[in-house]
From Swiss-Prot:
Pfam families given in the database record: DUF3627, KilA-N
UniProt keyword Coiled coil present: yes
Domain KilA-N, chain residue ranges per copy: 51-157
Protein name: Putative KilA-N domain-containing protein R904
Record lineage: Viruses, Varidnaviria, Bamfordvirae, Nucleocytoviricota, Megaviricetes
Regions annotated as coiled coil: 159-279
UniProt xrefs under InterPro entries: DUF3627 (IPR022549), KilA/APSES_HTH (IPR018004), KilA_N (IPR017880)
Keyword line: Coiled coil
Domain of life assignment: Viruses
Record has Hydrolase as a keyword: no
């Protein structure tokens, strides 16, 4: 091998622009050559001698140099189109542009893209050998059939590359979606936990409210018992200091609809005012301007009306039952109130 050929072979094997570089050594053993899968020399199928081999270049029988993969384009053109010659390609303006681009791409000078072999006594190997990167351009110029075959392969390669790119994009999107789905699941789980905690808290609050209501009612009952020991009948007096009022809530709240107020004369107005702060639409449906003992009166009312299943409630709050109307309530309370006076 000449020094020039060795230098070109070294440049090809170390370039990173053309095909894939072949840093591994090429071993010849029983004519089986192991190389990088992208090495153009893989098209070789039979050795001519130590320097050259026959190769199959898209069904074109070509001669390829063993050390650098250069292909005899003179013989390739003769085989593809007997009317064309290598000299014709060299004169072509497009060809010169291709050579220029190949030099820029490979980093080789123009004189290193081509090797001329005289062949000596062996005319088989005689001709111009071209760098593999421009062989397809020359073959396509010489043969329209080859150009179409090469176009199909190029399009197939581009399509496969783009398909791989699309798969990568889809894969990345799928990963992003999975990450987001996982995040959404985590947020949903947190939301579920918060809803459960809120539900538990709501139940606790309701229990506390119920307990507070019970305590308030118990307190009212205790106050009733502590404030007075009442009899069924009392003596009417001109100095009545107690007042008894029944309020109607007129509210959509899930509370009792009616409320009784038992207060001293000088505090009943404040009690009504405070109640209206809780229930702005509340109204007085009954106001006994005089009663000897409003606490005792209310105990008697509850006792008699509950026993007749006319009202239900706890403490000072109550609802009417069945067909027991507001008018009947006022009538019954008036009767109970009047029945307490001695005649």
């Amino acid at each position: 091998m000449s020094k020039t050929n060795k230098k070109i072979s070294s440049d090809i094997n170390h370039t990173t622009k053309y095909g894939s570089k072949t840093p591994k050594k090429v071993y010849l053993s029983n004519k089986v050559i192991k190389r990088n899968k992208n090495d153009i020399r893989n098209i070789s199928y039979k050795e001519i001698n130590d320097e050259f081999s026959w190769g199959n270049y898209l069904n074109l029988k070509v001669i390829i140099m063993n050390d650098n993969g250069y292909i005899n384009v003179t013989k390739l053109i003769q085989q593809a189109n007997k009317e064309k010659k290598m000299g014709d390609w060299n004169k072509n303006k497009d060809s010169k542009n291709i050579v220029k681009s190949a030099c820029e791409y490979t980093g080789l000078t123009e004189d290193k893209l081509f090797i001329i072999k005289t062949g000596g006594n062996n005319s088989t190997i005689r001709g111009t050998y071209a760098h593999p990167i421009i062989v397809a351009q020359i073959a396509g110029w010489a043969s329209s059939d080859f150009a179409i075959k090469a176009s199909v392969i190029i399009n197939d390669y581009i399509a496969k590359q783009m398909f791989k790119e699309h798969e990568k994009i889809i894969e990345e999107k799928d990963k992003t979606i999975k990450r987001r789905d996982k995040k959404i699941d985590q947020l949903n789980n947190k939301m579920d936990d918060l809803l459960k905690k809120n539900d538990k808290m709501s139940k606790r609050i309701k229990r506390l409210v119920d307990t507070a209501d019970d305590l308030r009612n118990q307190n009212d009952d205790i106050n009733d018992k502590l404030d007075v020991v009442c009899n069924d009948r009392v003596v009417q007096s001109d100095t009545n200091t107690h007042r008894f009022v029944i309020m109607k809530n007129n509210s959509d709240k899930e509370d009792y609809e009616y409320h009784s107020i038992r207060r001293l004369k000088n505090s009943v107005n404040n009690a009504v005012k405070e109640y209206k702060e809780l229930y702005p639409d509340a109204e007085i449906i009954m106001n006994l301007g005089y009663t000897p003992n409003s606490i005792c009166l209310w105990n008697n009312i509850k006792k008699k009306l509950k026993s007749k299943r006319k009202i239900k409630g706890t403490g000072s709050d109550f609802n009417l039952r069945g067909d027991f109307t507001e008018e009947k309530l006022i009538e019954e309370v008036t009767k109970i109130h009047n029945s307490r006076f001695e005649r």
